[in-house]
């Protein structure tokens, strides 16, 4: 939607008359000399906050974190589990009514305050638990994302072998079908194709066939356990080394902060598309690929009434855009105050969706070919859903490249590693920033080192034979639902408690543009109501989670709910803590005061802050005069505000 230019602001986003009332504005900031000095000292620190070298670096950084594993890894298997093409319709609807509004809101709040995901809650201090709860969910996501990096690195290393190890069957895999093309098998392995084909035909009548890429992943790489009732096993030493190397890379990138990440973002954001388009070009030429693409794109209208599909669409949108976790707020906080983020928000959200569709079409083209090779009647039968999909179907496609598949495999898994690094660096930077904001004397690189070491230790649980079970559990309880409920509190705290009009006034001051009706309606009604309805219904109809069509043991479900409780409890616990430590008369008065912006709320720069206070004061006086001059002025003003006029 268009944003209309406001005539009363300067080009830099500050009012043109901001220099006439400096002494009055200083008195408005604080009436206490000591408090005023403390705020000035804090403002000096914030004024010296590092900015991006240019706007393109910020845009590329947002692309690198939003266009990542969520698109190439999570979106295909989420669509796979929710009816293929049926998932696209709710996903696109959710994108426009929830994803884009939330993404734009987080960009705005970060740039306006120049603060991280916890410090922004000076807007509504008793909601500070939202920031800490999101940090908890971010830690959960980081731990299992890093295990995916370990798997990616493992595949990258073995891709240097003379023959891709997942492209052929082992003798002990009696239900195996080679992932490598038949004609290439004849060339590389001799005249054994007819015997293998005869064996496959015989087995297909009695046993479910599995591709060699799937069996390699399950039996060789993760050594998956079919049941975790007796424990998850011990970490695999090869994956442990890969996990350690991954965290070393993460630390080396993160220890320098955002100063150098903007330069790396060009490569992190653009390189993956080269490999993705090449893989797509190969995938669509495979036999059966059209059937897979049709399955992906053909909508099943009945699924639109399934609230679980809508819930998964919201969760996928959040994971894909990195909404509700903090990186977008953190990145935007390093922008100049007058940076035009509207364009960036639209570019990133649109590109993110197109990348998800690109990844989905590619993976389903491969699944269609797998179904053709395994003589499966239904594409859903060719491979199990779950986190292993990207490590089964993508390698299967790579093995079909007859011209130097090893080279393409190296490029692909390096691309996947780059995508993962881009995502985790942003998430990890969010955690390090939160800690450094609370303990300003701590060295950034030391905090980065400590958090990286903790991330490695926590990631060890995912490289055990039962690691994929734990990943599913943590993703569901520690990531999905915690992010979901805290995003509802985030939006309600900003739009309903602080107030839609107050928030839109702040946007107008910062951007020198009016906020259109689309954003106002989404923020005030459509986005929060949809999220609340979907969350309540999904919780009321929640079913015990499964992995590989098997239910978790009771202990697993209990652990999962405890994980969710810890994340969700951050909101009320920190709210109670703030109210208890900031008493203002009675309990009711203290609660009411905790819902009002603190003296720290507003732009970090002293000049922008003074201009903002004057801007808000002028608007309040103008609206009061309009309400007095017209009997229905109050209601007319409310209507104009909602319409963005």
From Swiss-Prot:
Residues 1-48 are annotated as: Disordered. GO terms for biological process: amino acid import across plasma membrane; D-amino acid transport; neutral amino acid transport; sodium ion transport. One of its GO terms (molecular function) is D-amino acid transmembrane transporter activity. GO terms for cellular component: plasma membrane. Residues 33-48 have a biased composition (Basic and acidic residues). InterPro entries: Na/ntran_symport (IPR000175), SNS_sf (IPR037272). Disulfide bonds: none annotated. Keywords: Amino-acid transport, Glycoprotein, Ion transport, Membrane, Sodium, Sodium transport, Symport, Transmembrane, Transmembrane helix, Transport. Its main location: membrane. The keyword Membrane applies. It is found in: Membrane. Signal peptide: none annotated. CDD domains: SLC6sbd. This is Sodium-dependent nutrient amino acid transporter 1. It comes from Drosophila mojavensis (Fruit fly).
